[in-house]
Amino acid sequence: MKPPDRPTPGRTDRILGVMGGMLRACAVPGQEGPQERDPLGPGSTKTESECTEEDQTGEREREVLAWAPQPESYSIAGSEGSMSASAVSGLAALSGPSSGLSSHPCSPVPPGPVTGLRRWLDHSKHCLSVETEADSGQTRQCENWMLEPTLTTGQELPELTLLTTLLEGPGVKAQPAEEETLSQAPKNEEEQKKTALERSMFVLSELVETERMYVDDLGQIVEGYMATMATQGVPESLRGRDRIVFGNIQQIYEWHRDYFLQELQQCLKDPDWLAQLFIKHERRLHMYVVYCQNKPKSEHVLSEFGDSYFEELRQQLGHRLQLSDLLIKPVQRIMKYQLLLKDFLKYYRRAGMDTEELEQAVEVMCFVPKRCNDMMSLGRLRGFEGKLTAQGKLLGQDTFLVTEPEAGGLLSSRGRERRVFLFEQIVIFSEALGGGGRGGTQPGYVYKNSIKASDPAVSQAWIKQVAQILESQRDFLNALQSPIEYQRRESQTNSLGRSGGPGVGSPGRMAQVSMHTPINGSLPSLLLLPRGEVPRAPLPLDTQALSETPLTPYDPPALPTVNSPPGQARLAKLDEDEL
């Protein structure tokens, strides 16, 4: 729809005249306008209908005055210039009957300023409705003409839409919520990345600062205790055992002080170098494994002289921490690296950075502490004749309930708790001593038995069988949770020609083993054969070994008599993680 043409100067004068009369009536509510000339003469009288129409016109004017605002001092401008409200009132008064909008003598109801004002407001409403239908260019022209007319000098008109606002209510154009959300989304995403990057740098700063404090703590040991003992000498009872107390802590201190701390400080300028730093020094970090392996021996010596000789040295050096508190720092530090790296990886990934090498660094720093923990447990093992380092890697360790045959080949009715260490070439059974690690002291272990695997193939067979037994126990757990699904799967297995007897993965086999296990099933169970029996050939773990003694009523059906390796074990452990 085409917007209406711009008003001519003559029309502007008429509009100003209407508004001037309206404002004059508002300024003096009780005052009437100039008396109009009666065409019938001074002696004429009006009819009753004319009086009624005049009364109705007066009521309509009073209704308009009721909601019309009080006049303010503002200027009204047209194409000819601007004038104040008082000037407009005077102009309307002077115009009188000569104005084009004055009452007509023959009209029973003079149009008056109210009627003209209503017409003008209706026309304004019509132009405002055009705004939603016209295109953007035409809408802007109509809006500029009706709402924001300007003078030739560039000055803006005051708000001419005051009365329209009173009739229609205020209309505020707000930006759609969807457009506002879309405009803010990229900004919020960038702010989140920036915040995540700042947090990653905070973690990196914490890593460097704690590394500096860690080097200072190691310096108290090397440059304090060790230097003083080398200068003043050690007691006769401690001579030759002082190296056991400190282990290789001097090597750790010098490497961190001269190399690792400086390289970490360089990472503050280039954070991408942090991952490569830990990956590069993976082999160097294994000196912590050596330190942790010696740590139990160090604790034993320190317990003998800690309250006497080393306490005197602490007071002499003026240290706040005791020597035992300083010697635990390397163990705590190697555990702390993985925590800080995980936090740095989390925020660095949120910042949109490349984290492939950083993930490898986290894996490295998770493996090294595990090795340290294993070596500390092995360092507490006593009574084993041989070198533990010659038994290959430690594959795992856990606590089991072990049942050994008594005299006459009968199984004991009560299992014994044993700590089992699985190496590549041997399985070691030990008994735990001490309070189980409560109160800050780690338990020691006394050697009880072992199972030697002389062939790597035998070792792999053991590992395979252990994995199968763990899988069977998962199946047993699934059978308890979903018996119908388990029976359906077993029936399909039997239909394929496999033996339907209780096997490794059947609940019947587990029930058979449980006849000889104690009531407490929180720990796994192992069955050890009499000591001294020489095996002829290694057998899988799921083969029942029989002795030459008569079978008890609780024994399973007889199988071909074979010999098994000493300590042939049967695991009946439900994986605690699965529970």
UniProtKB/Swiss-Prot annotation:
It is found in: Cytoplasm, Myofibril, Sarcomere; Cell membrane. It comes from the Eukaryota. Residues 317-338 are annotated as: Important for binding to Rho GTPases. Its main location: cytoplasm. One of its GO terms (cellular component) is sarcomere. InterPro entries: DBL_dom_sf, DH_dom, PH-like_dom_sf, RhoGEF_Guanine_NuclExch_SF, SOS1_NGEF_PH. Interacts with activated GNAQ and GNA11. Interacts with RHOA, CDC42 and RAC1. Interacts (via the DH domain) with POPDC1 (via the C-terminus cytoplasmic tail). May play a role in actin cytoskeleton reorganization in different tissues since its activation induces formation of actin stress fibers. It works as a guanine nucleotide exchange factor for Rho family of small GTPases. Links specifically G alpha q/11-coupled receptors to RHOA activation. May be an important regulator of processes involved in axon and dendrite formation. In neurons seems to be an exchange factor primarily for RAC1. Involved in skeletal myogenesis. Residues 27-61, 172-194, 487-516, 546-579 are annotated as: Disordered. Keywords: Cell membrane, Cytoplasm, Guanine-nucleotide releasing factor, Membrane. This is Rho guanine nucleotide exchange factor 25. GO terms for biological process: axon guidance. Residues 199-375 form the DH domain. It comes from Rattus norvegicus. Residues 472-498 are annotated as: Sufficient to bind activated GNAQ. The guanine nucleotide exchange activity is autoinhibited by the PH domain. GO terms for molecular function: guanyl-nucleotide exchange factor activity. Residues 380-499 form the PH domain. Disulfide bonds: none annotated. It holds the Pfam family RhoGEF.
